[in-house]
Amino acid sequence: MMREDGNLRYTTLLFDVDNTLLNFDASEEEAFKSLLIYFGMEPKDSLLQEYHQINRSCWELFEEGKMEKEEVLLRRFEIFFSRHNCQADGREAEAFYRERLGDSAILIPGALELCRDLSRKYDLYVVTNGVADTQYRRLKSSGLEQYFKGIFVSEEAKSPKPQKEFFEYCFEQMRLLGVEHPKERRQEMLLIGDSLTSDMRGGENAGVDTCWYNPKGLSNDKDVSVTMEVSSYEEIREILLF
């Protein structure tokens, strides 16, 4: 954990969702293995790992602005199934997978309580990549939605996190929700997330302080500046609630 001093100035917390509050890896595994069975394939862990690599590569291209979201959603399945000589339609695969994923909202233990307690002291907003309908469904069914004053999704922003345009959209939405001059109050904001490439880079691009939620103890190999780093919710509490 890194912390400069005890006099924190933050009034607003911007939270990532997947693998920060919700266990996306577990939800993804459930949805993808159901998809394999649907197309007559054995749901092996090795196939899940192969899909992970393809999916991550596609989303990284999206974050860099080199691939459109719709292309990501289809191409990841087209690439995977073509490698296994399976005549699966990309749109059918995406629709099936998306439905299963939207039905799965597995909380990281302590996430609900953390957001509840933080919401008593700070204004909380969601900043997430992904499909809007899916993210809204998962946030609602998990019980997290009630603690956030706004939910900002890349699909609706028409720009991916970490791009500056995504955060321009977020600031404008905050203004429409009644926040006065949010862009000029960036020094009061802290972005909390697990991803160096989308969350920490996003905060850097937006001029917002960042808190890298890093429970796996990964190394910062992306040359991204991080304001503070934590490995647990307990450390977030120590910084923001005490």
Placement of each model-derived feature along the sequence:
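Catalytic-core regions built around general acid/base machinery
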Residues: 110-121
